[in-house]
Amino acid sequence: MSKITTTNLLKMKQEGQRITAITAYDATFAKLFDDEGAHVLLIGDSLGMVLQGGQDTLGVSMDEMVYHTRCVVRGTTNALVVTDMPFMSYATPEQTYQNAARLMAAGARMVKMEGGDWLCDSIRHLTRNGVPVCGHLGLTPQSVHVFGGFKVQGRDEFQAQEIYRQALELQAAGIQLLVLECVPTSLAERISKALRIPVIGIGAGPATDGQILVMHDAFGITSGYVPKFTKNFLAETGDMRAAIRLYVKQVSEGTFPGPEHCFN
């Protein structure tokens, strides 16, 4: 597999090839995922929960995201490396640009921001200055206290229409990739068909252009609570390398996620 770019991902969408993404936080696992064909590696602020033991992602700092980006980049040859902008690091266009520049200097090739059309000015500012952007709608973990917990979004008609509208607005502002998290399958399918850019789902059903999982969930390494949309691939294979190979295969074939992993 050659080096993955946003152009490659767009072509995959156009040709109906599914995109496999997974979180990574260090060089060792980044190399494993890269070797087994993952197209996108996300340095997620989920590290605040799965690595640091926090109850949410809000305490993760820019310095920590820069550090983990450097680690992942060292283990990656082909996959597109995307890094989360942490909580309160993109309140204004100029602040967004300064922080995104740090992540790009650390080796990221795209940054991800959570939120709707209030981000459009910052997205335009980044894209004008050479920084590719991934959007994130639905359940946005940095807004967990606004939502009152980690809950499925877009189940009523008003909320679904708002998420759909915001997806179009973010695309118009310049995002090149969109993550949809914990939304009904029907809404994710509608958005995926409406957008020209690739849509990556997590808890969003099988009709998106690709899937992403937190690596700990894919290996069944949890602290007790197991999200409905996850699958323990390690339990099926008994080997980490084989587990990721199976994940990539099932995403590519469209057999993951199954009905049991979806929200209606």
Curated annotation (Swiss-Prot):
It is found in: Cytoplasm. GO terms for biological process: pantothenate biosynthetic process. The active site is at E181 (proton acceptor). The keyword Amino-acid biosynthesis does not apply. One of its GO terms (cellular component) is cytoplasm. Pathway: Cofactor biosynthesis; (R)-pantothenate biosynthesis; (R)-pantoate from 3-methyl-2-oxobutanoate: step 1/2. Keywords: Cytoplasm, Magnesium, Metal-binding, Pantothenate biosynthesis, Transferase. GO terms for molecular function: 3-methyl-2-oxobutanoate hydroxymethyltransferase activity; magnesium ion binding. 3-methyl-2-oxobutanoate binds at D45, S46, D84, K112. Coiled coil: none annotated. Its EC number is 2.1.2.11. Mg(2+) binds at D45, D84, E114. Its main location: cytoplasm. It holds the Pfam family Pantoate_transf. Homodecamer; pentamer of dimers. Catalyzes the reversible reaction in which hydroxymethyl group from 5,10-methylenetetrahydrofolate is transferred onto alpha-ketoisovalerate to form ketopantoate. PANTHER family: 3-METHYL-2-OXOBUTANOATE HYDROXYMETHYLTRANSFERASE. Belongs to the PanB family. This is 3-methyl-2-oxobutanoate hydroxymethyltransferase. It comes from Aeromonas hydrophila subsp. hydrophila (strain ATCC 7966 / DSM 30187 / BCRC 13018 / CCUG 14551 / JCM 1027 / KCTC 2358 / NCIMB 9240 / NCTC 8049).
